[in-house]
């Protein structure tokens, strides 16, 4: 139906770890995400883009999202990755418990990923959102999407889609990650499936689509 907030691929490193780019993870202890998770899948995509393998890390751990903050603050890992909307509780926990910093993930490999895959986009995490990171962090990510089944009646989808777009200010207030949503982008960017006919009718009426 529409895309929502971006979920940036986020690299969090212990302060003083010597990690200032994705490639600096070589020789470090890195949480790569638990098997079968979206975190792990995205990490493997990025590793492949940079020509890296698990063996390039001094240690590759598989902690869940709920475990990562404790592990990095206990000194068991040097860095963790998390693809999530911001602000994120796990990153807040880490940044308020110990000295960590967000690291930008950029370069030609990322530019190519974004260019080759319509579901990826450049993403920015505002500076000051987390303790220890005062400047903006540039990375890439996916857009969370609001989906429905193709079998749902068009009139039902029409009502929902129109209500969201006509009340976008109220929708933005539902979660901090929604604060900067732009209806024009929501109906055009980061969509990996066709727009339902009911939603399309609503968007055309509202002038969001031709």
Segments and roles (model prediction):
Residues 3, 7-74, 169-172, 185, ...:
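Bilobed "Venus flytrap"/periplasmic-binding protein-like clamshell domains
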Residues 67, 74, 84-102, 112-115, ...:
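An extracytoplasmic/periplasmic, membrane-proximal ligand-sensing/linker region
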Residues 18-19, 30-32, 49-52, 82, ...:
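Short, low-complexity, polar/charged sequence segments that are solvent-exposed and flexible
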Residues 54-152:
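Pocket-lining segment of extracytoplasmic ligand-binding domains
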């Amino acid at each position: 139906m529409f895309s929502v907030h971006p979920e940036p691929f986020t690299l969090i490193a212990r302060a003083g770890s010597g990690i200032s780019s994705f490639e600096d993870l070589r020789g470090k202890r890195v949480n790569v995400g638990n098997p079968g998770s979206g975190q792990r899948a995205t990490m493997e995509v990025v590793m492949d883009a940079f020509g890296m393998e698990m063996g390039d890390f001094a240690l590759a751990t598989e902690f869940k999202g709920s475990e990562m903050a404790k592990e990095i603050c206990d000194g068991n890992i040097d860095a963790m990755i998390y693809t999530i909307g911001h602000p994120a509780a796990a990153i807040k926990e880490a940044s308020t418990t110990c000295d960590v910093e967000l690291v930008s993930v950029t370069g030609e490999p990322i530019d190519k990923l974004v260019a080759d895959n319509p579901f990826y986009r450049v993403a920015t995490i505002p500076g000051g959102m987390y303790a220890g990171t005062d400047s903006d962090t540039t990375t890439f990510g996916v857009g969370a999407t609001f989906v429905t089944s193709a079998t749902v009646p068009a009139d039902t989808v029409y009502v929902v889609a129109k209500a969201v777009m006509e009340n976008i200010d109220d929708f933005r207030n539902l979660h901090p990650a929604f604060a900067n949503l732009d209806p024009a982008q929501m109906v055009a960017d980061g969509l990996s499936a066709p727009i339902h006919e009911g939603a399309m009718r609503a968007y055309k009426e509202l002038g969001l689509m031709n």
